[in-house]
Each structure stands twice: as C-alpha cells, then as structure tokens.
Amino acid sequence: MCIRDNAEDLPKKLPNIEDKVVISIDDWQSRRSCPKGKIIKVLGAPDSPGVDILQIIYAHKLPLRFKNKVIKEAEEFSSDIPEEEILSREDWRDRPVFTIDPADARDFDDAILVEKCDDGSWELAVHIADVSYYVKPGTELDKEAFIRGNSTYLVDRVIPMLPEVLSNGLCSLVPGKDRLTHAAIMKFNSKGSVISVRFCKAVIRNAHRFTYEEAYSLLKKPDPKNAFSERLTTAWELAKTLRSRRFKSGALELDMPEIKVILEESGKPTNLVRSENDISHQLIEEFMLAANEAVAKHIKNKMRPSLFRVHESPDADKLFDFRQLVLSYGLEIGDPSAPNELQKLLKSIQGRMEEHVIKVGLLRSMKRASYSADPLGHYGLSKTNYTHFTSPIRRYADLIVHRVLAAVTGSVPSSTPKFDELQQTANHISSTERTSSSAEMESQKLKLIEFLWNEKKVCQDGSPASHPAIIHEVRRKGLFIELTDLLIKGLVPERALPHCREGYW
C-alpha cells in the first residue's frame, strides 16, 4: 500500500514499522494498482496489551465510545424513581423475585418468581428491565441504541448498547434497589399448558442474586437453611415441565458447550473454563422462551406491527448434505425435513462419540435466525409466534417490542412504528447482530490460539501438549478437526500428517 502522508511526520505517527494501524483508503483504481490511503490511527505494537482486540474492534467498525450528548442525556436521570411513577405501577417490592446470571454480569435484564398453587398449577412472573421508561423514541439515547443495535461481548470487554449509567445502573435489576420493570405474568396447569397471561408495568426490588454456579449447586443439593433454595426448586419443577413439553412439540435440542477464556489484566489468556447448558441455565432459558412467546402471541392477536424473531426451515440441499453425513456414520434417519425425525436422531446419539459432529453438522444446515416484521415463526424452537422481549438492555429489538407491547396494553399512547419502518429496523439490527457475532467469535478465537501458543512454549522440554480431538471432515488438503476440550476447530494440513505410503495417511 502507498501511504499518503507527510514524510517528515510519518515517523511520529508510525514509530515502529510493525505497529498495527487503522487506515482509510482514498484511491484504489484497480486490483493491479497500489491502493493509496492515509493513517488515521496508530494502535500500537502487535504485542502491546489490548492491541489485538482493538484491531478486531476497528475492523468491524464497532463504536468504542458514546458521544458526549448521549452520555449527557443518560446522566440527567435521577437515581430516585418519581413517586407518581411508582404509584402508577404494580408494586412487587415485597415479593421475593430473584435473578440468575453469570458471575461477571452487571447488566441484569430479568428477574423471576415462581409460585406453586394449591390446585397444582404454577404462576410464573418474568420481570424485564423497563428500558423504555428511560429511552424514548427520537432521543439521543434511542438514536445511538439503534445505530449499535445490540451490545457486543468481546473476550475482554463489553461494548454496550446503552451507557453504563443505564446498562449497569438504573436499568439493571441489581439486588436491594427499586427498579422499574415490564412484566409477563403467566399461569400454567400441571402439564405446562398456558392457562392465562397478563402484562403489567411494575416496580420490584431484587431480593436475591444467584450466579449460575450458585443456582446449580442449590438445585443439585437443596439447602433448608437457604430461604431461596425451595423457591429455586419450585422454579426448576416448572422449567423442567415446560422443557419437556417444548421438545414434545418438535423443538430441537441443540445445546452445545461453550468455552470462556480467563484473561490476566494484560490480556494474556491463563485458563479456559468449559460451560455446559446445565439445569440452572435451562431454568432461565425456559422462562425467557415462555415470556417471548407470550408477548409475540399477544401482539400478533392485537394485529399490531412489531418485530419478530424468525428462523426459517433449512434448504433441501443443505438437509441432503446433512443426511449424507448421518449415513456416513452408519446411523439411520428418515426425512430430515421432519422435526420428529431429527429429534429421534438426536436422542439416539446422546452420549455417543459422534454426537458432537452430528450436532455441528445439523447446525451448519440451518439458516441463521434474524429479525423481521413478518411473524414467520421459529423453526428451531418449533414456535409459530416468537419475538425477543427479555433483553432490552442489550438488544434494540427488545426495546421496540416493549414499546409495542405497552401500546397494545394501554400502558402508553398507542403510536407505534409502521410495518415498513419496522422491516428496515429489522434488517439493520440483523446486520449489527451478525457484525457483533463475528467480532465476538474472532476475539475468542484469537485468545484461544494465543493460549495454545503459550502452551506450546511451556512444553519446549520435548513433551508436546495433547488434546482429545475429533475429525469433522476429510479433505484433499488434510483433516478438519476439533479439539473437543477446547472447542477449537482447524485444518491439519496433509503435509503435517504421518504418511503410511504415498497418498495415504
């Protein structure tokens, strides 16, 4: 590249030739010509702390800071809720609502309460942070939230959709503080079928904050001395019933483990923690799914334009490729377009060595979920009506849905966006979601590779580090494998494999 810059000034901007820089390309007439541009920012040396992640942030054009006018608007809110606002809402502050979140979370979107009734039915209250009280349409906060579309969770930081004074402060359902919520109150019979649903604006005071690890521990070993242990057990009874009912209706069980990279302050990866979708995660998952579906049904029944979370059925050619993969393992499958056939397959491979490969193959055959103003349904969840309502602190889609729900329930004036405007919003936030997902995966991959590289340097005594692996694909150029303990995928080139004889490994 030809850098257009003042020759005398260049050493000041680029003190080291290996520095990572951000450039803008001013002219690139053809691929045969050298592009011309200018340096707009020097990130620093490649091995400087944080430069690797900054490179990803700039490459994906993610915003690093909020504009001053956005921060100013956020800081104008009082930490005290006006008394007239509290009086206009249902008061749940004396009810034992609680939260379950990751240990390092600070933006608590949701709180729950489950009560078992004498007739064997359950009442589930899902309280969601009422971000729409603070972020009004057309404000600077709203414009910025729309541009960002969602929060981005990189391996070493969060790039929030809203300023921290809201995302981690006034909107976050932290313990012991009065917080405004938009609630879905659902009643289920003993078999998990919905009896009734109502929605309300409320004020709560989070009575207890669980981490997922704490909740899991109490669910596996209840503690009579813990006042919330029994409530947690009751909640899991309902969640387990809803989960069973969901899979019977055709939902696909595609839960996959995840890896969390633990970093030093310098950004160096020191440990990897494997996270499974255990019963504490499943409990919250089922309640959020129930609330999202209830909201989608209500809005659709009121025939009000809104945003929906949609997941279309896979293309036939993708399913054909998946079927070939299944058959190559000697497994049986009927019509792969039939959810019951996929369920039967997934159940038959539980605990088997090929389970992970088959699940990955099935996920690859699926279309990507997105947002739409058309209620097209959700294939993977087997739901005709579905939306996103439960995370308005970190997703703009949920904020829009909160506004629409408030309009149809009479909580606020009834003006809401038209269909065409909503579809444009859906296209935009689907795009920002893809961008964030790409950046998140890239930052994770970067630190996983760094972890392996450091592991290799530690093993210079000649005893190489070893990891269990599975082969996903056999290609002409080598083997596409996955380290199952680290969930890292990559190609082992043919030249690196031991050869039995020419053309064979």
Where are these regions (language model features)?
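Charge-lined substrate channels and their catalytic hotspots, especially those that engage the 3′ end
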Residues: 1-125, 132-177, 447, 496-499, ...
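Short helix/loop capping segments that flank catalytic or ligand/cofactor-binding pockets
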Residues: 32-34, 47-51, 108-110, 134-137, ...
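Conserved catalytic alpha/beta cores of large enzymes that bind or transform nucleotide phosphates
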Residues: 151-248
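Glycine- and acidic
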Residues: 164-167, 220-225, 269-281, 303-309, ...
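Conserved pre-motif C helix in the palm subdomain of viral-like polymerases
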Residues: 189, 227, 233-241, 277-297, ...
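Core structural elements
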Residues: 246-270, 286-296, 313-314, 320, ...
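Structured C-terminal cores of nucleic-acid metabolism proteins
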Residues: 294, 312, 317-320, 326-505
